[in-house]
């Protein structure tokens, strides 16, 4: 069990690594993430676009699960949004959802898996 001084030190350390200017990401949003990839001695940014189906909030360890369908196969990736490997996050579209986790989209195909757009 951590005492209070150790917990404060950990919180101060976490504040240094939290990205301050992230867009507000909600469940159902379509996002475009730029992920840094190192191949040999080269570094490049690869973009990953999909729908946010889950989000786990826990300060520096906040993760989002992004799902996209590529050539008829569903692909899901979990991203730490405060990771230095994430170069950029852009919200392309907001969707109207009434669930905190959209795992039911895994069983839907084609037009059935579309979400209604939410305008702000």
Curated annotation (Swiss-Prot):
SUPFAM superfamilies the record matches: Translation proteins SH3-like domain
Annotated GO CC locations: chloroplast; mitochondrial large ribosomal subunit
Keywords per UniProt: Chloroplast, Plastid, Ribonucleoprotein, Ribosomal protein
PROSITE patterns linked: RIBOSOMAL_L19
Pfam family, one: Ribosomal_L19
Database matches in InterPro entries: Ribosomal_bL19, Ribosomal_bL19_CS, Ribosomal_bL19_sf, Translation_prot_SH3-like_sf
A Gene Ontology biological process term: translation
Signal peptide limits: none
Primary location: plastid
Molecular function GO labels: structural constituent of ribosome
Subcellular compartments: Plastid, Chloroplast
Family, similarity comment: Belongs to the bacterial ribosomal protein bL19 family.
PANTHER family per UniProt: LARGE RIBOSOMAL SUBUNIT PROTEIN BL19M, RIBOSOMAL PROTEIN L19
Protein name in UniProt: Large ribosomal subunit protein bL19c
Source species of the chain: Thalassiosira weissflogii (Marine diatom)
Gene encoding the protein: rpl19
């Amino acid at each position: 069990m951590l005492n209070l001084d150790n917990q404060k030190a950990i919180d101060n350390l976490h504040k240094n690594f939290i990205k301050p200017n992230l867009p507000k990401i909600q469940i159902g949003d379509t996002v475009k993430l730029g992920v840094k990839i190192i191949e040999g001695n080269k570094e490049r940014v690869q973009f990953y676009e999909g729908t946010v189906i889950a989000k786990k909030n826990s300060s520096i360890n906040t993760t989002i699960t992004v799902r996209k369908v590529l050539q008829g196969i569903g692909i899901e990736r979990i991203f730490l949004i405060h990771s230095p490997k994430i170069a950029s996050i852009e919200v392309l579209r907001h969707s109207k959802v009434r669930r905190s986790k959209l795992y039911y989209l895994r069983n839907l195909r084609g037009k059935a898996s579309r979400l209604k757009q939410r305008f702000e």
